[in-house]
C-alpha cells in the first residue's frame, strides 16, 4: 500500500491484483499528483470525466464530485472499487464506463492519463470531441518521457490548441482547449488478412498488436493442440486469433474468449462473427479479471499468452494470477498451454504451481510450455 496526500483527501492506495512483495509497485504516480494540483474544488462545475485511471487515485480523490471513470480495463475498475472501499468511500460515488460508451455531455473537467497506445488515445479524444465545449477544462498527464510530439499533435488535430507544462517529478501535463478543428472520420476498427487463411482480423483501438499478427502469437499458433473436446479458454484473448484457430482445429470443443479489455472481447466476438459465424454457438465471450468467479474444475484446456507488464510497469503479477486461476478452473488432467518470452522463466513458475511443466517448442525468443493439473493438491 502507498499513501497519496493531495488537496482533496488523504488516500491509502494499493495496486490490483494486490501483492505481498517486499517492495511493491506504487498504486499512483507523480502525474496523478500533478493533475490534482491543477484543480480547485470551487472551479469544478459540470460532470467530471476521468480517463485511464489505472488504480483509482484520481477517482478516489475526486469522489465527492461523482466522477465518471472511463477506460478499457476491467482490472482498473476493480482496482478503483477496491481503493474506494479501502478509503471508506461509497462505491456508488464513481460511475464506470468503457471507452466505447457514450460519454456524458458538457463536462466541466476532463482528466486524462495518457495511455500507452496512441490508437486508444485517438479513440478517446474523438469520443470527447462529441461532448466537450470550449469551457471544458481538459488536462492530460503522464511521465514526461511518455509525452511525445505525436501525442501533442493528436490533441491538436482532434480537439484544438494544446500546450505542455514544465516537468515536475518527471511528470508533464498537457492543457488543451476545444475549438472543433476540421477532422475526417476514422474507422472504428483496423483490419488485416491473416496469412494462410481466408480470415480478416478486426481490431478495436486498444487491442495488442492491432496492425498485424504479433510474433509470439505466430509461434504459438504453430503448436496449438488439436481434437480437444469440452470447453477451452483463450485467456487474455486480445483480438481472438488464438481462440479462432482453436475453434477451427477443435470442432468438438467450445472456446471461451476471456480478456479484461472490453475492446479485446468486442474484437474477438467480431472476428468469430465475420470469419466463423457457424462457430458462434461454440463460443462464449467474457470480460473478466483472468478467471475470477468462474467455477473450479470446468475447463479441459486453457491457452494463454500472458502479459509481463501492467500499465507502464514490468511485472509478472498478472501472469502469476492467470496461472493460479487456470489451475483452479481446469478439470483433473486438464492442460494449460502458454507462450512466453524465454527470459521470463515461466517454466519454474508453472512447475511450482502445477508440480510439472513440459517444453513443447522453443526458438531464440519464445517458448511454448504445457502444464497438467494432476490432482487437488492446491
UniProtKB/Swiss-Prot annotation:
Gene3D superfamilies for this protein: Vaccinia Virus protein VP39
GO CC, alphabetical: cytoplasm
MF annotations from Gene Ontology: 23S rRNA (guanine(1835)-N(2))-methyltransferase activity; nucleic acid binding
Entries under CDD domains matching the protein: AdoMet_MTases
Record EC number: 2.1.1.174
Catalysed conversion reaction: guanosine(1835) in 23S rRNA + S-adenosyl-L-methionine = N(2)-methylguanosine(1835) in 23S rRNA + S-adenosyl-L-homocysteine + H(+)
Pfam families with a match to the protein in the record: MTS
Alphabetically ordered keywords of this record: Cytoplasm, Methyltransferase, rRNA processing, S-adenosyl-L-methionine, Transferase
Main location: cytoplasm
Subcellular location: Cytoplasm
HAMAP family xref list: 23SrRNA_methyltr_G
Family (UniProt): Belongs to the methyltransferase superfamily. RlmG family.
Function: Specifically methylates the guanine in position 1835 (m2G1835) of 23S rRNA.
Name of this protein: Ribosomal RNA large subunit methyltransferase G
Species, as recorded: Shigella sonnei (strain Ss046)
